[in-house]
């Protein structure tokens, strides 16, 4: 059985197991195993040949990456916002490299990167996903670009980034793990915890940590504990822009806004509401 089959098996067991106090420990161990398997997939994809990756020199006060499926309008938006020359076409994978542009706004110099479209399976290397994700990991803000007719892409994109160790709109859990030579695992916290001390010890043992003192200053869940143990997560703010609204009828637009009320709705091609995108980016970067 391969890694992907192992992942599917663990995911299915998690789905089938009702969550309650009696099963929380078992589910926590399953999530720990799932995180290890996903990390193996990402590492395996990273170790494969076939591509030099992308080398992007960061510039300006902050770097923003436009993330979306192929042909959702990322290149058009970059061109309209910055005047950069990213090839535009109504077919998939028009952008085969990272195209940088610069937005000067409210006395800030913001680098905006147009990367090749992400697709399902990107975290495991599909569609140059490995190279694209390496760029995303180093940016200061993710701007999701969705097609108004295919807004379900948002869930796929966030899951791919999650599987690649990118945590969006979250803060790093306040957990300190101090390894020791002996003494087993001791756990202390500054508040009552959602997770049990036994589960904390079990997760650390899963990652071959058998002697350590763990100090927890947040009421974390098991996913956040796993993130803290793995130590290779990045935490990036994210916002959402829905494009091609000029092509949508009232019903489609209404349904999309019900699903994504916080998104900014635009037509990059018709240059509709682009000032709102500039404000969105500037505010999210919290200058």
Feature roles, as predicted:
Residues 2-197, 201-207:
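Conserved G1/Walker A P-loop phosphate-binding module
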Residues 5, 22-25, 168-207, 214-220, ...:
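Canonical P-loop GTPase G-domain recognition
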Residues 133, 226-229, 253-254:
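Short amphipathic alpha-helical segments and helix-helix/interface helices
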Residues 136-138, 232-235:
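Flexible, charged surface loops at secondary-structure boundaries
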Residues 219-232:
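Phosphate-interacting basic helix/loop segments used at nucleotide- and nucleic-acid interfaces
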């Amino acid at each position: 059985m391969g890694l992907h089959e192992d992942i599917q098996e663990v995911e299915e067991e998690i789905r089938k197991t009702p969550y309650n106090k009696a099963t929380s420990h078992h589910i926590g161990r399953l999530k720990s195993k799932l995180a290890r398997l996903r990390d193996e997939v990402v590492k395996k994809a990273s170790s494969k040949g076939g591509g030099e990756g992308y080398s992007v020199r960061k510039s300006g006060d902050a770097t923003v990456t436009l993330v979306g499926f192929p042909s959702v309008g990322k290149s058009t938006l970059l061109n309209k916002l910055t005047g950069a020359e990213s090839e535009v076409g109504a077919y998939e994978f028009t952008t085969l490299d990272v195209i940088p542009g610069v937005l000067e706004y409210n006395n800030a110099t913001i680098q905006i990167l147009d990367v090749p479209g992400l697709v399902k399976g990107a975290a495991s290397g599909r569609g140059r996903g490995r190279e694209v994700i390496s760029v995303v990991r180093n940016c200061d803000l993710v701007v999701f670009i969705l097609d108004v007719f295919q807004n379900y892409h948002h869930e796929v994109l966030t899951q791919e980034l999650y599987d690649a160790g990118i945590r969006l709109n979250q803060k790093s859990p306040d957990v300190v793990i101090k390894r020791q030579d002996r003494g087993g695992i001791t756990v202390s916290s500054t508040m009552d915890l959602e997770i049990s001390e036994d589960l904390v010890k079990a997760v650390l043992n899963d990652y071959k940590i058998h002697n350590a003192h763990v100090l927890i200053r947040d009421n974390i869940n098991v996913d956040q504990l796993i993130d803290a143990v793995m130590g290779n997560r990045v935490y990036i703010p994210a916002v959402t822009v829905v494009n091609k609204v000029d092509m949508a009828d009232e019903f489609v637009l209404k349904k999309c806004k019900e699903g994504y009320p916080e998104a900014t709705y635009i037509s990059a091609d018709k240059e509709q509401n682009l000032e709102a995108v500039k404000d969105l980016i500037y505010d999210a970067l919290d200058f």
